[in-house]
């Protein structure tokens, strides 16, 4: 939480099924980091144990086998993964090819720079079929889809509705 407050990173957590198992602080950070305005955890600091709030809002991606705790799942856009079968042939990531991703990184940064005013002023319609928390979860991605345009606004909203329906089944 101190790192999040100071550097405002994007949090990428792999092996979440083992990492979160007995890590109450991490679950609190994930749960508390859902809303930009109210996202904070309180911790005592210094020799006097003075209570201090730490902001914990940050974009987060959590990869894991299985489902997270209900409170984490309710604050998430869940994309279910499955364990790779022994017969599946997957090309591993080669660190030396990392440089191939830099042009994409630069294009995304440029796109954001060119569109940040539109994104900040966008008040996207979210699918009414979603519950209130799910609507909060998808609002930013709907704004991005609206600014991108084309088929993306409709495609994205339909995908969110289908994900919500699958979760209810």
Descriptions of predicted regions:
Residues 12-14, 41-45, 54-65, 78-80:
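Structural recognition of the conserved hydrophobic beta-strand(s) that form the central parallel beta-sheet
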Residues 1-10, 40-41:
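Short glycine-rich substrate-engagement loop in P-loop NTPases that contacts/grips substrate
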Residues 1, 14, 49-50:
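Aromatic/His-enriched, Gly/Pro-containing loop or helix-boundary segments
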Residues 10-33, 65-74:
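Conserved AAA+/SF3 P-loop NTPase catalytic/coupling segment centered on the Walker-B
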Residues 2-5, 21, 52-54:
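Short, charge-rich binding segments
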Residues 52-56, 65-169:
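Phosphate-sensing "switch" segment of ASCE/P-loop ATPases
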Residues 25-52:
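Conserved catalytic/switch belt of AAA+ P-loop NTPases
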């Amino acid at each position: 939480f101190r790192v999040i407050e100071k550097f405002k990173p994007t949090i990428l957590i792999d092996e979440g099924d083992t990492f979160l198992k007995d890590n109450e602080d991490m679950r609190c950070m994930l749960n508390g980091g859902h809303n930009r305005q109210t996202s904070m955890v309180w911790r005592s600091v210094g020799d006097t144990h003075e209570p201090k709030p730490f902001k914990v809002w940050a974009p987060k991606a959590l990869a894991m086998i299985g489902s997270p705790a209900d409170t984490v799942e309710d604050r998430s856009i869940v994309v279910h993964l499955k364990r790779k079968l022994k017969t599946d042939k997957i090309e591993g990531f080669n660190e030396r090819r990392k440089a191939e991703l830099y042009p994409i990184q630069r294009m995304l940064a440029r796109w954001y720079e060119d569109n940040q005013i539109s994104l900040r002023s966008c008040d996207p319609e979210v699918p009414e079929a979603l519950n209130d928390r799910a609507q909060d979860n998808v609002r930013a991605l709907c704004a991005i889809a609206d600014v991108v345009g084309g088929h993306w606004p409709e495609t994205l909203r339909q995908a969110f509705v289908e994900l919500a329906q699958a979760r209810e089944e």
